[in-house]
Design a protein with these regions (language model features):
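Hydrophobic alpha-helical segments
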Residues: 1-114
Length: 114
């Protein structure tokens, strides 16, 4: 599935949109396209950021972040969302910090054997 949604580039963002881009910025300093699709209605980005952080980055979550990214990756596989899978498993791989282990985990997910 693909969609074409007008996105306001970061370089053109002002006011509330600029503020939301700053809030949605990743630790690497980028704003993911999944957030940028909200650029015409910044208040919807606010809700997306809040949901994302409550699921993956809330201080009360005791599961390791790498595991949460693996769960998000498996959810992406089940939803046939290559975009989300690419980003979540990239994060998981970085957090796992062992490419062979990450490859085994990915293979298990891809074969529906998590």
């Amino acid at each position: 599935m693909s969609a074409w949604i007008k996105m306001i580039p970061e370089s053109e963002a002002t006011g509330p949109l600029r503020e939301m881009y700053d809030q949605a910025r990743t630790p690497h300093g980028t704003v993911d396209n999944v957030m940028k699709v909200h650029s015409l209605r910044p208040h919807t980005m606010q809700g997306h950021v809040a949901l994302y952080r409550s699921v993956l980055h809330h201080p009360d979550i005791t599961l390791p972040v790498w595991f949460l990214e693996v769960v998000a990756s498996y959810t992406s596989i089940k939803n046939n969302c290559d975009y989300s899978l690419t980003h979540h498993f990239h994060n998981a791989r970085q957090l796992i910090a062992d490419n062979e282990r990450a490859d085994r985990i990915y293979a298990a997910l891809a074969n529906s054997c998590p």
